[in-house]
Regions:
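GIY-YIG nuclease signature motif recognition
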Residues: 75-76
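Conserved catalytic cores of phosphodiester-cleaving nucleases, focusing on short active-site segments
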Residues: 87
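Basic, Lys/Arg-enriched alpha-helical interface segments
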Residues: 1-71, 80-84, 92-112
Length: 112
């Protein structure tokens, strides 16, 4: 039996995946870093900690941090059945995370 966690991506009602589209529009080197980070998340699940993941204050969201020059971030939640739902991906441009990015993830969670 496979003990690894599973990854799901948020999909709109029309079955589009904005997170996967975001990833596909990044350069290959960054995509490879994302694959590596997602592999860590699948392997270690909720026990993965800084510098890879961080709890988003005052929300149910967690932030997966892709270390590198592009500062890529993903907001996700842990669901039952050992599954993570990736809600939103973005490039962090400032020290503090833009509240609009958190809002997008929370709206997608409510839509899910």
């Amino acid at each position: 039996m496979d003990d690894k966690w599973k990854i799901e991506y948020y999909k709109t009602k029309s079955k589009k995946s904005p997170v996967e589209e975001f990833i596909l529009n990044l350069d290959v080197k960054t995509q490879n870093k994302i694959v590596d980070a997602l592999a860590l998340l699948k392997e270690f699940g909720v026990t993965l900690s800084l510098p890879h993941v961080k709890k988003v204050t005052e929300t149910s969201l967690w932030e997966l941090r892709i270390i590198g020059k592009n500062n890529i971030r993903f907001f996700y939640i842990a669901r039952t059945e050992k599954t993570f739902l990736i809600l939103h991906g973005f490039q962090k441009k400032k020290q503090k995370t833009d509240k609009r990015e958190i809002k997008v993830a929370l709206e997608r969670l409510a839509d899910y």
